[in-house]
Regions:
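Glycosyltransferase donor-sugar binding loop
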Residues: 214, 241-254, 269
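Short His-centered aromatic/hydrophobic patch
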Residues: 97-102, 121-122
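Acidic donor-binding loop of glycosyltransferase active sites
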Residues: 167, 281-293, 306
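Membrane-proximal helix-turn-helix segments that form the acceptor-binding/catalytic region
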Residues: 81-85, 125, 140-169
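N-terminal subdomain of nucleotide-sugar transferases
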Residues: 1-48, 233-236, 363
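A charged, aromatic-enriched C-terminal amphipathic alpha-helix characteristic of glycosyltransferases
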Residues: 340-374
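Nucleotide-activated donor-binding/catalytic signature segment of Leloir-type glycosyltransferases, i.e.
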Residues: 254-274
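Conserved donor-binding/catalytic core segment of Leloir-type glycosyltransferases
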Residues: 170, 195, 203-221, 227-230, ...
Length: 382
C-alpha cells in the first residue's frame, strides 16, 4: 500500500509517531511524508531538519520551511508544482492527514486523485472543553460578552466540516473513545499515542529512594498538586529524592519545592532521550498528577517497567494492574505499599509493560493505523 502522510512534524528523535510509520513501511508498504523543516523540541526550542530523508520505504520531503508556511494557502501555492510532482509520481492509495490544519491540503489531493482521507487528531472536539482541540484558533473567539459559547460554536462547525471531509477519523485521546463524538456516518477510532524507546545499554540500577517526573510544566500537568503531595511523600515514606525534568509555565512550582527541600528536589531543564529513559528505568516509581496528556512520560514509564502513580484517571488506567491510581490525600499510603509489598511492585511493573507492548508500542500503533487504512480503502472503493 502507498500511504501519503501529511504531518506538521516528523523526526525520529522528537516524534514517537515516526516509529509507528516506520513500522508500517517495514511491513512491505510505502510512505511518502510531506512536512516542514521546523522541529519544536520540549521546552519550545526550535530546530531545523533536513529537507529530504530516506529511511527504507519511508521517504520524507520537508518541502515547507516552517509549520506556519505549511498551513498557509499562499505559501503552499508557491510549492504547488513540486508537491504535485511528488504526489503524482508516488500515486497514493490513501491520505493519512495529521491534524485539521493540514486537511485543506489533503482535500485538494483527494479531489485530484480520488483517494480516501484518514484524519488523525490528538483530540476530538468537545464542546465542554472547546480549547482542547484547535485551542490557538478558537481562543480568538473568546470574549467577555459571549464567554466560551462563540468559540464552542465555531469549533463545532469546524469539526463537522472536518468529518465531512474525512473518510475515517482517529483520536489519540482515551476519553474520546468513551464519548464517541458525533460522526455523521464517518468511522471513528481511538488509537493511543505511541511510545518508542531505543535499546538502552546497561542493567537496571534502580534507586529505591528516588522518583521522577518528566514533561512540559504546563497547566494541564497539574503541578500545583505537587506542593501538597511531595512534602508528604518526602517526610512520610522512604523516598529521599524527587527528580524533575522539563520546563514551562509552572516552573515556579518546582522552584518552590526546591527552596523547601534543597537536598531532595533535583531539577534538570533538558535531558536527551536515552538519558530520560535511563532515569525512568532506574527510579523506584514515576508520578504524574496530570489531568490530561503526559502520554509520552506515561508510556515511557510502562516501557521501562517502572511503576507509575497517577492521581487522575484520564488514560483508562487500571489500578493495581498497570498503574497505581490514587487520590492526593491517599498517595502516601499507596507509596508506602509499593515499598512494603514486593508482589504489588512487580505486578504493577509487569502489567504496565504488558500494556505498553500490546497497545502503545510503535509496532502496535503502526499495525492499528495500517488496519484503518485498509478498511478506509475497502469502503471507499465500494
Amino acid at each position: 500500500m502507498n500511504i501519503l502522510l501529511i504531518t506538521p512534524g516528523i523526526n525520529k528523535t522528537f516524534n514517537d509517531n515516526y516509529h509507528s510509520y516506520k513500522s508500517i513501511a517495514d511491513d512491505d508498504n510505502n510512505i511518502l511524508a510531506i512536512s516542514n523543516q521546523e522541529i519544536v523540541a520540549k521546552g519550545g526550542d526550535l530546530r531545523k531538519d533536513k529537507e529530504v530523508e530516506i529511511d527504507g520505504s519511508l521517504v520524507i520531503h520537508r518541502i515547507f520551511k516552517s509549520i506556519r508556511e505549511q498551513q498557509s494557502f499562499v505559501r503552499r501555492f508557491l510549492y504547488k508544482k513540486k508537491l504535485n510532482n511528488l504526489v503524482s509520481e508516488f500515486r497514493p492509495d490513501v491520505i493519512f492527514c495529521e491534524e485539521i490544519s493540514n486537511l485543506r491540503l489533503a482535500m485538494k489531493i483527494k479531489r485530484e486523485l480520488g483517494v480516501p482521507i484518514i484524519l488523525r487528531t490528538e483530540f476530538a472536539f468537545d464542546a465542554d472543553y472547546p480549547y482542547r482541540s484547535m485551542g490557538r484558533l478558537l481562543k480568538i473567539f473568546k470574549n467577555p460578552l459571549t464567554g466560551d459559547r462563540l468559540a464552542s460554536a465555531v469549533g463545532g462547525l469546524i469539526w463537522r466540516w472536518a468529518y465531512s471531509c474525512a473518510d475515517s477519523v482517529i483520536s489519540c485521546y482515551y476519553e474520546d473513545a468513551l464519548k464517541q463524538p458525533e460522526v455523521y456516518n464517518t468511522p471513528f477510532y481511538y488509537v493511543p499515542w505511541p511510545t518508542f524507546h531505543p535499546n538502552i545499554e546497561g542493567e537496571t540500577k534502580r534507586k529505591k529512594d528516588r522518583a521522577v517526573f518528566i514533561g512540559a510544566f504546563e497547566p494541564h500537568k497539574n503541578l500545583q498538586e505537587l506542593l501538597v503531595t511531595i512534602p508528604e511523600i518526602l517526610e512520610k515514606t522512604p523516598l529521599k529524592e524527587f527528580c524533575f525534568v522539563g520546563a514551562g509555565h509552572d516552573l515556579g512550582v518546582i522552584q518552590q519545592l526546591k527552596i523547601s527541600y534543597p537536598d531532595s528536589i533535583t531539577h534538570i531543564r533538558s535531558l536527551g532521550r536515552e538519558q530520560c529513559l535511563k532515569l525512568i528505568r532506574d527510579s523506584f516509581f514515576a508520578y504524574s498528577p496530570a489531568t490530561r496528556g503526559g502520554w509520552g512520560f506515561i508510556g515511557d514509564s510502562w516501557a521501562m517497567k517502572t511503576p507509575i502513580i497517577v492521581t487522575h484517571n484520564h488514560y483508562g488506567f487500571n489500578d493495581n494492574i498497570d498503574s497505581v491510581v490514587t487520590a492526593p490525600q491517599d498517595i502516601v499510603n499507596r507509596v508506602k505499599s509499593l515499598y512494603e509489598n514486593d508482589s504489588e511492585f512487580e505486578r504493577v511493573r509487569t502489567g504496565g509493560f504488558k500494556r505498553y507492548v500490546e497497545n502503545h508500542s510503535a509496532n502496535a500503533v503502526g499495525a492499528r493505523f495500517l488496519e484503518i487504512c485498509i478498511l478506509a480503502c475497502t469502503k471507499f472503493s465500494e
